[in-house]
Amino acid sequence: MKNPILLFLLIISYLTGHTQYDAHPVIKWAPAGLAFGKLSLGTEYNFKKKNSIELYIGIPIAATRTIDYDNKQSDIESKVFSVLAGYRRYIGKKPAAGFYAEPYFKYLEHHAQGILEGDLDSKVARMDTKTDYKAWGAGIQLGYQFLIAKRICLDFFLIGPEANIARFNSQSTDIANSIPWTLIQSAEAERQIKDAISDIPILKDKLEISVDQSKKTVYTEYRGFLPGFRLGASIGFRF
């Protein structure tokens, strides 16, 4: 995590020290990040009339959501760290407003944990689950930015296809008791984890799944290419 933060700070330092154009920097906030476990803050430097550099950092904060697992409700807490840097080109005549295209690079870490409540062969199971996702990605964002009274920015991320090199793994251990699983319980645990993963469309057919019967644990792992899509909105203030 330290290297992306350092890169983020170095870029900001470079821009503030070398910009000749009256930049009018914009400070932005993307509220949707709160639902995923991050405070997403950004800045845009309009270094030429139609050209900007945009930087975002996602600061991890805890977010809890309820998921369905084995026909029961379970809570999962997640946190996200992210860094994004993009070069934005506006199509219209006004600076920092109108339609734009923005190639970007990003780094993202997503961590989640929680207890999945269920049953294995009619016995109570409590799956202590941890997931870890890390990815480097690149994409192109198409969007539209409104500039109200030359100060308030409303930025809409309309279409943003991206490509990622990712690593994902998870570990789910039954902590209900210390008795080893039977073969039937092992098979049921694997099936239940597969069903839970099916809610993640881009991962469900790619994961390698293994079961350690004596440790009462299900492992999943994936390394490789993953497609992605960026959309959303932010609100900002232009200085």
Where are these predicted regions, by residue range?
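Residues on the lipid-exposed face of transmembrane beta-strands in outer-membrane beta-barrel proteins
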Residues: L41-Y45, A85-R89, P103-F105, A138-F146, ...
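Bacterial Sec-dependent N-terminal signal peptides
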Residues: M1-A23, I235-F239
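Outer-membrane beta-barrel biogenesis signature
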Residues: L15-K28, S214-V218
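A contiguous binding-surface segment within folded domains or other stable secondary-structure elements
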Residues: R89, K94-F146
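Long, hydrophobic N-terminal alpha-helical segment
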Residues: P25-A30, L34-N46, Y56-G58, Q73
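Outer-envelope beta-barrel architecture signal
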Residues: Y21-I27, L39, F47-I53, P95-A101, ...
